[in-house]
């Protein structure tokens, strides 16, 4: 019989010594909620929440328990599951050596904004709150990749700028601003805003977007945030696929834990964070976090990760779905596709990356290939493909733009872009339809349909693409040819043209 995950059954779960299940040994009632986290999904629960749990478990940290926040109606599911389990959940780590289970207790509460927006603002403004961390995906920042400015005309931002809506914000920035106003009125320091999203210069972008928002509301608040605020840049890494029913069943059968929403992940985890906190921080360095003083160090790690790991994910997600693959490890098991990924990293991306003292890029690439090949975590292509309009401009297009600038090789990267332009139509090479999960889906599909096998229509979206792409003849020729070949022959029949020794 599986034990329902709860405080009541925690000792029973931990007593299964033959399973070596780690459970919280600290008193979860004897903590303060010093971190408010917006966007509690799989990645947060496998990353920041695990680091905090380790600090509480092994180093006696008690002032940085987490209060989760859900801003969207869809977050009601997470609220309900966590509440039913006393806000605990299980992390399942999978590798070739087998699976381990770890009950995480660092999340102590969860606030659902659609039910009570005031409670969220009050929690962020509370003196005990030192950090508000974010995993809100790229689209949640309302950041124009082309102009590097806030999308101030977006209806959600316009809603939050309206003084009549000051007490009922919709966006993360609306909540952050409202809470910052209260802290200033109370004579408190601003909390640190800690982005944990996959974006180059994520802290700087967060700072600039919040300050831009504040300037439109009250310029004096923008000045206060600029003077006293903390927005660390950070590089985060841990592959975390969507939880499936078989995952839940395995946890119940193998570990005797009845958990409605566990997290499945890999053993590897990494976090490099700039030491730029406004109101104190936990001793993250005690649990393996690389805390660095120089923002350039973070940016270099981040650039390596986004351009190699995340770009490779894109190179598997968009061509892979068109070709009918379902999982990352399936792509890596295909000899031709595996060569394509390796050659893209080595010949097109690696030459554009800065050297980091003590980091062997070839070894890093080999580690990525091993991680991608892990069949036990069953990482789904739809997961790594979602929100493509936020990912491709971050992960792939910058390498293409830099290759244009230095007249470097970019054919494989362009092939990935061509596949993305086909992917947004939601039809694979065999005519099977699939869902395109993207906040810009309608615009992307409209442009892709209008353009056919030509890229000009989709490249006209100025929030995603700059003139450096639209005006480069070499890029336009390569991407047009790739789009025509893919439309006529399919992804896998076209790919050999982009692989040496295919």
Curated annotation (Swiss-Prot):
Keyword Oxidoreductase: yes
Keywords assigned: NAD, Oxidoreductase
Reaction catalysis annotation: D-mannitol + NAD(+) = D-fructose + NADH + H(+)
One Pfam family here: Mannitol_dh_C
InterPro entries, alphabetized: 6-PGluconate_DH-like_C_sf (IPR008927), 6PGD_dom2 (IPR013328), Mannitol_DH (IPR000669), Mannitol_DH/Oxidoreductase (IPR050988), Mannitol_DH_C (IPR013118), Mannitol_DH_N (IPR013131), NAD(P)-bd_dom_sf (IPR036291)
UniProt-annotated binding residues for NAD(+): 35-46
EC number assigned by the record: 1.1.1.67
Main EC class the enzyme belongs to: oxidoreductase
A GO molecular-function descriptor: mannitol 2-dehydrogenase activity
SUPFAM superfamilies reported in the protein's UniProt record: 6-phosphogluconate dehydrogenase C-terminal domain-like, NAD(P)-binding Rossmann-fold domains
Family membership noted in the UniProt record: Belongs to the mannitol dehydrogenase family.
Described purpose of this protein according to its UniProt entry: Catalyzes the NAD(H)-dependent interconversion of D-fructose and D-mannitol in the mannitol metabolic pathway.
Subunit structure: Monomer.
Descriptive protein name: Mannitol 2-dehydrogenase
Organism encoding this protein: Pyricularia oryzae (strain 70-15 / ATCC MYA-4617 / FGSC 8958)
